[in-house]
Amino acid sequence: MCIGGILMKIAVMAGTPIDSKLGAELLNSYGYNDVVLVPISNNPVEQTTFQALEDEERENIIVKIIDELKEKGCEVIFVYCNSLSSVVDFDRLAEKMNISIITPMQMYRNLGLEYKYLAVMAANSHGLTGVENNLYVSNPRLRVLGLSMLELVKAIEEGNKPEQIVDDFNF
């Protein structure tokens, strides 16, 4: 897509291939069609294992991927994964590596200002903690009910319809 006459290639980085695809679909719906899918893991369990790595090891993997994306001409990275953006300091990496990186955590810092109470459902405790922390940055008085459930993410990844998920999990 052109922004101000400039064509941009955007990398969609996410925890799994399904998440990457969902992120690309979101961008496509806004006219951003030159996207590169960057799943970090093959499935939610692998992604949770990746997130449990030592900080330095995890960051080294992400830095290598960012270097490869820059070589491919990607100018922006859109991180479409709460838990991944919770365990990697993408704000710092964006500055350090001179690339624009957009994450859900940036949005949560704004969202916290709009509400008094929020319920947060996340794949795992990494994502839940990151979302809560970023909500509280903007609104320390916010009341958050948090739930982490990897099985819910697996159901989404399997392509289950929302109605089926509601029934299966007794929501």
Spans of features found by a protein language model:
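Non-catalytic structural scaffold of enzyme domains
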Residues: 2-171
